[in-house]
Amino acid sequence: MKKLTMESLSVYIFVMGVCFTSNFTCEQKIVLIQEHKLRSICISTCYVNGVLAGNSSCVSVKTSYLINLAMLTNGFKAMRVGNITSISEKTAFLRVIINYYFRGVMLRALIAQRLPNAANLSSTVNCWLDDHSAGGVMTLFYGTERIVLNSSTEINASRWISDGQDANGTLNILNERVSLDIYFLSKICPQLSSEIYKKKVAHPKYFSLIKNDTKPKKFLRNTWRSAWSNWYKYKEIKEFLDFSSDYENFSEITYSMSAAGLFFLAGGAFTMLLLLCCLSMITRKHIVKDLGY
């Protein structure tokens, strides 16, 4: 048997420690800017054990990657909460909660439903797993107000709480089906942080949780607020809704540009055809005159 060198031994100890010490944090900040059209700037920044693992547009978070890693956890496999038991329902739940708290969707929902005058809003999700404890904390920041849900081996949370007066009734929305939030924080997210840390250790050079996006500004549709009028928390589990529907997508912009381009192209072609016809008639008259007809 080959002897372990000090370097390989250090790597071995480091990798073995992965399963026992992991800390995963993602921060989202959304800012609304009223220019000639309303724009939304949403930035997501993620850290794995304090090391940057992505910083770009919220819509560029690798949700499918996070969902696939979360599906590896025992918490996901054993999930039986809120009448969610089938694989398809549990997968839909992961898709929804990751979009809510890792891609800024919940921030847009709160602005549309409870905080119409908000120009900016931010949130943080932090999960950890070590030898002594496991758990997670979700925190929303609005002005000087902080709203928190903390669930771990030391704290058995039952509701979101605010250190302010909650004059806008934000807690009414957040505490809907709060058992799903608590289950994710206490049973899935800590193990997810461990899975993420393993991937970070295996591929330190290329690992990232967010795709690069040089254009974090997104145009919001004129109807984006009204689209949330009939929304309630976790509605998307049963109704497969598009989380990007608040934004004008590239295909629509491309289509409108293409339509305009086709209009001008058709107009130009018609003008050229008209000129050719006129030139042909003038040339024909000269030929007839020269022949003496």
UniProtKB/Swiss-Prot annotation:
Which keywords accompany this UniProt record?
Answer: Glycoprotein, Membrane, Signal, Transmembrane, Transmembrane helix
> Where is this protein primarily located?
membrane
Q: Where is the signal peptide?
A: 1-21
Q: Which domain of life is it from?
A: Viruses
Record field: transmembrane: 262-282
The cross-references to Pfam families, in alphabetical order and at most eight, read: Herpes_UL37_2 (PF07413)
Cellular location(s): Membrane
Query: What membrane topology is annotated for this entry?
Result: Single-pass membrane protein
Carbohydrate-modified residues: 23, 55, 83, 120, 150, 156, 168, 212, 249
Quote the cellular component terms of the Gene Ontology held in the record: membrane
InterPro entries (UniProt xref)? Herpes_UL37_HHV-5-rel (IPR010880)
Q: Which family does it belong to?
A: Belongs to the herpesviridae immediate early glycoprotein family.
Q: What is this protein called?
A: Putative immediate early glycoprotein
Gene name in the database record: U18
